[in-house]
């Protein structure tokens, strides 16, 4: 990736600007031209063509460069103060955050149970296929709550002998299991609703129970909406999965209620049609969730911009680094594993080389996206690949 000549040996007591000429530096005077901050007309954003399309591409390029320089600035701060953020949360603040996350999860599970009981009663009273589809969705909320609680609980009990690299992979696996069950349920509702439409089979609804159904389903939608807002205030992936689940419930409850009311007031077939809409929405949404989480488990590479950011950090880590042979970052769960090969002088004492490699590893693992970093130290870079070739 790059190399540099020898830049003076010996220990450095203090560093001046002249001593740091080996470092990569980015300027602070780069700004996106003002004309690219302005949004093009609405029609041009929908159908980019001609000069507007070119303007959009150039603005995107400048924005990308601006973000890259911002990343470089963060890496410089990390090299200077030893951490990414001087305002990083303390241990007490982290404990408070964890306490808040547990409260959000427990509150979601308790409310899901209460609302599920209410929706079961609404389903029994209305016999609406759309309401039943929404109720079955709430049943899976309870199942998802158990799966996500179990994965969160398991991740908090590490076992370095049985699970040497931790249990963080349990999080996407739990989400995949839940999403698969959600998709299966949606498919079953789709089949039953289609059967009702084909056979012209439907239930006669009692108008006296209409207000009770409206109150029950509306209350569920309102409660779920506020739960969604609360859970979205957290950064924890499991809590945010709950937020996504609550958002789905707002949609399915609203569609189920509207479909049932339209079926009562106008045409009976609007009820199974609403159930089909809920089923299709459930299947497509959770299929997308499965694809996203499977992608985190199969070792997908980090974006080129992130690898560039890592390379900048590695190069500026220590003056004695002669060459960067390899920089890899790939998903193995929700975070990245990073592999780095650096070249140091061949006559450097082992203890000194070890300290440089270990401090670089610790620095890389401070990045919030990185779960584990592996730093390999070598004295030359002309050798053949050291790992078994891919078949």
UniProtKB/Swiss-Prot annotation:
Stretches in topological domain Vacuolar: 125-134, 193-210, 265-266
Top-level taxon of origin: Eukaryota
UniProt-recorded Gene Ontology molecular function terms: monoatomic cation transmembrane transporter activity
Membrane topology, from the record: Multi-pass membrane protein
Cytoplasmic side of membrane: 1-103, 156-171, 232-246, 288-391
Record key words, sorted: Ion transport, Membrane, Transmembrane, Transmembrane helix, Transport, Vacuole
InterPro entries, per database record: Cation_efflux, Cation_efflux_CTD, Cation_efflux_CTD_sf, Cation_efflux_TMD_sf, CDF_Transporter
Gene Ontology CC annotations of this record: membrane; vacuolar membrane
Subcellular location: Vacuole membrane
Segments traversing the membrane: 104-124, 135-155, 172-192, 211-231, 247-264, 267-287
Stretches for region Disordered: 1-21
Key word 4Fe-4S present: no
NCBIfam families: CDF (TIGR01297)
Protein role: Involved in sequestration of excess metal in the cytoplasm into vacuoles to maintain metal homeostasis.
PANTHER family registered for this protein in UniProt: METAL TOLERANCE PROTEIN 9 (PTHR43840:SF2), MITOCHONDRIAL METAL TRANSPORTER 1-RELATED (PTHR43840)
Family stated for the protein in its record: Belongs to the cation diffusion facilitator (CDF) transporter (TC 2.A.4) family. SLC30A subfamily.
Name by which UniProt lists this protein: Metal tolerance protein 7
Species for this entry: Oryza sativa subsp. japonica
């Amino acid at each position: 990736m790059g190399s540099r000549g020898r830049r003076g040996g010996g220990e450095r007591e203090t560093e001046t600007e002249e001593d740091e000429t080996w470092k990569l530096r980015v300027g602070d005077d780069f700004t996106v031209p003002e004309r690219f901050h302005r949004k093009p007309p609405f029609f041009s954003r929908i159908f980019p063509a001609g000069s507007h399309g070119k303007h959009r591409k150039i603005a995107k390029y400048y924005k990308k460069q601006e973000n890259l320089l911002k990343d470089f600035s963060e890496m410089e701060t990390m090299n200077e103060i030893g951490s990414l953020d001087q305002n990083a949360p303390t241990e007490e603040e982290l404990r408070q955050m964890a306490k808040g996350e547990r409260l959000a999860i427990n509150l979601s599970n308790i409310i899901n149970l209460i609302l599920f009981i209410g929706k079961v009663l609404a389903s029994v009273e209305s016999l609406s296929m759309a309401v039943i589809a929404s109720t079955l969705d709430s049943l899976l909320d309870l199942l998802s709550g158990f799966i996500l609680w179990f994965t969160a609980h398991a991740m908090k009990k590490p076992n370095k002998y049985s699970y040497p690299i931790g249990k963080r992979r349990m999080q996407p696996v739990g989400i995949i299991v839940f999403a698969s069950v959600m998709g299966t349920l949606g498919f079953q509702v789709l089949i039953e609703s289609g059967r009702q439409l084909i056979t012209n089979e439907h239930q006669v609804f009692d108008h006296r129970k209409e207000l009770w159904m409206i109150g029950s389903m509306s209350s569920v939608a309102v409660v779920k909406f506020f739960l969604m807002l609360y859970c979205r205030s957290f950064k924890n992936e499991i809590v945010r999965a709950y937020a996504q689940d609550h958002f789905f419930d707002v949609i399915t409850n609203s569609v189920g209620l509207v479909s049932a009311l339209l079926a009562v007031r106008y045409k009976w077939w609007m009820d199974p049609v609403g159930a089909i809409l809920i089923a299709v929405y459930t299947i497509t949404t959770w299929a997308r969730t499965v694809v996203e989480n499977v992608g985190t488990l199969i070792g997908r590479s980090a974006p080129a911009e992130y690898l560039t950011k890592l390379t900048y950090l590695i190069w500026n880590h220590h003056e004695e680094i002669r060459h960067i042979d390899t920089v890899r970052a790939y998903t193995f769960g929700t975070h990245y594993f990073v592999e780095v090969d650096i070249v140091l002088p061949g006559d450097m004492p082992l203890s000194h080389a070890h300290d440089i490699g270990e401090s670089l590893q610790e620095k890389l693992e401070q990045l919030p996206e990185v779960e584990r970093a592996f730093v390999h130290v070598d004295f030359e870079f002309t050798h053949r690949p050291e790992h078994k070739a891919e078949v």
